[in-house]
Amino acid sequence: MRQAHPSGLNQVENKCLFNSRGFSLIEILLVVAMTTIVTAISIPQIQSQVDSYRLNSAVAMAKWAIQSTRFQALMKGYPYQTAFSSANANYQIQNLPSGSTYQNVGNQVPLAAWPMTFSADTTINFRPNGSVTATVGSNIFTITYRGTTKTITVSNYGNVTVN
């Protein structure tokens, strides 16, 4: 009569299972090497996406500043302007409620926490009738971050386009 092995498996099956627990050192090293290679390939792509995101957020901030300042001029009934500083990469919103000198509205606002570059100082003036003029610089300016440039164009009536 045949007796069953105490584990319920015959000796050959038991030996195969006993020797096949876990991963070998070669298998682990191959997985680590492949993970390292994939990570090394993806890091430049991720950095490029982060740079693009940072530039796009600065451009969106500038666009928002222009559009909201135009809205304030239309709503309040007196001139407003947005002054972009190329030296400090920030902007200042100003208004002219009465008198001949523009007054700051709030503090200077940095365009981004990263070192952005403006093409030139630009001040865009918004009249209560909806007209827009550039009193310093032009109504076309660029913002650059790590070699990538976006051009912002403001039409005579406040339409903002980005290229």
Regions found by a protein language model. Name each.
Residues M1-C16, I37, I41-M75, P79-N163:
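N-terminal helix-rich module
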Residues R21-A33:
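N-terminal signal-anchor/signal peptide hydrophobic helix marking the start
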